Amino acid sequence: MKIVPDVEPAAEVSGNFKVSVLEPSIPAVHRVENKHPLESRLKNWEAQQQQIRLDSMRRIYGLHEPVRREMEQKLASQSSRPLALGGSANFHLDILANREAVLDETDIYAAPIPLEMTYQNEMAIRYGL
């Protein structure tokens, strides 16, 4: 069982060194990314933690518990919340993923709601009425 996701290499380095004495002999970098090395681990962190939770539930409760959780998460992700009621904050997914007490940038920097957008207008746009 892995707790931390694998590290993806940030750049590839070849062994082509400079021949001249006056020029510094450093390896040539073919691809450079402006990312911190921990960013690749953080990108996969949530998926890795979810897999650990599902594995531990399978060992404790049996196979039905992770299957039921994944079905609930799929159903909760398909539901949408109208813009007139505050946008796409999906509390059901947060509860199922055990993130109901987590406050991140999507909670603070939400997209502004158009002034003319009402529930009826949004349903008309969504269903082409």
From Swiss-Prot:
GO terms for biological process: proteasome assembly. The keyword Cytoplasm applies. Short-lived chaperone present in the precursor form of the 20S proteasome and absent in the mature complex. Required for the correct assembly and enzymatic activation of the proteasome. InterPro entries: Ump1. Keywords: Chaperone, Cytoplasm, Nucleus. This is Probable proteasome maturation factor ump1. Belongs to the POMP/UMP1 family. It comes from the Eukaryota. Pfam families: UMP1. One of its GO terms (cellular component) is cytosol. Its main location: cytoplasm. The lineage of its organism: Eukaryota, Fungi, Dikarya, Ascomycota, Taphrinomycotina. It is found in: Cytoplasm; Nucleus.
